[in-house]
Regions:
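Paired acidic/hydrophobic, glycine-rich loop segments that form the ligand-binding mouth/hinge
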Residues: 121-126, 144-146
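Extracytoplasmic/periplasmic solute-binding protein
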Residues: 1-5, 9, 19, 34-78, ...
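Glycine-centered hinge/linker elements that transmit conformational signals in sensory
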Residues: 37-42, 76-105, 148
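Beta->alpha turn/N-cap motifs
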Residues: 57, 108, 125-130, 164-166
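Extracytoplasmic/periplasmic substrate-recognition and gating elements
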Residues: 21, 99, 136-200
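Short helix-initiation/N-cap motifs at beta->coil->alpha
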Residues: 30-37, 103-117
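Aromatic-glycine-rich donor-binding/catalytic loop that engages nucleotide-sugar donors
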Residues: 16-28, 99-101
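Short glycine- and hydrophobic/aromatic-rich loop-to-beta-strand nucleating segment
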Residues: 9-13, 65, 168-170
């Protein structure tokens, strides 16, 4: 296989809503989740909308765990007992929902609309979410990108994770694997220009 792109996690924030709370975008860089919640509450209070929007799935919880090098699956086995990063991630997530800092949407279109309609001051997801964030022309220049918060009290916690990405692969039933590998190598595997042309679109 051949890696194609990476969905590095980002936090996209509305700079205008942050400024309404007397804060700056820089105030949201390199935070722990407890520091984030404190600042996010000010944004919620100043704007009357949640700081973050979520698609209601496990993406954000997985990103939180991943940022600390943890996973709910270890060596192919589900590991939820004695998983400190999972426990802390769930605690933070629930706390944000309870405080109105995080809004959950189970419908993808509503999730995207919450960003575009000003119903949230930010979102954490893979960097691919930026195209959705940029869809509202009237918000041009009002969004900024920072790194995500890191878990408090968890060894190895960082402000970085991944959500998504893509790879090309040659299946085992390919009739001409050598030709297929050569195609991948000579196109996606060796052409920066092709990447530059494909990825923005």
């Amino acid at each position: 296989g051949l890696p194609f792109d990476n969905g590095a996690s980002v936090m996209a924030v509305r700079s205008d809503m942050i400024e309404n709370a007397g804060l700056t975008v820089d105030d949201f860089k390199d935070l722990t989740w407890s520091e984030f919640e404190e600042k996010a509450q000010k944004v919620v209070d100043a704007n009357g909308v949640p700081m973050l929007t979520s698609s209601g799935g496990s993406e954000l919880i997985i990103e939180m765990m991943q940022s600390a090098g943890a996973s709910p699956v270890v060596d192919g086995e589900v590991k939820i007992a004695d998983n400190a990063a999972l426990k802390e991630s769930l605690t933070v997530y629930k706390d944000m929902v309870d405080k109105g800092i995080l809004a959950e949407y189970t419908d993808w279109d509503q999730y995207i609309a919450s960003m575009n309609d000003g119903k949230a001051a930010g979102v954490i997801n893979g960097c691919w979410i930026m195209s959705s964030v940029q869809a509202a022309a009237d918000q041009s220049g009002k969004w900024a990108i920072v790194n995500m918060p890191k878990l408090d009290g968890i060894d190895g916690a960082t402000n970085y994770a991944n959500c998504g990405g893509a790879s090309w692969a040659v299946s085992s039933n390919c009739k001409n694997t050598e030709l297929a590998f050569d195609f991948l190598k000579s196109t996606f595997g060796s052409s920066v220009e092709l990447y530059d042309d494909l990825l923005p679109n």
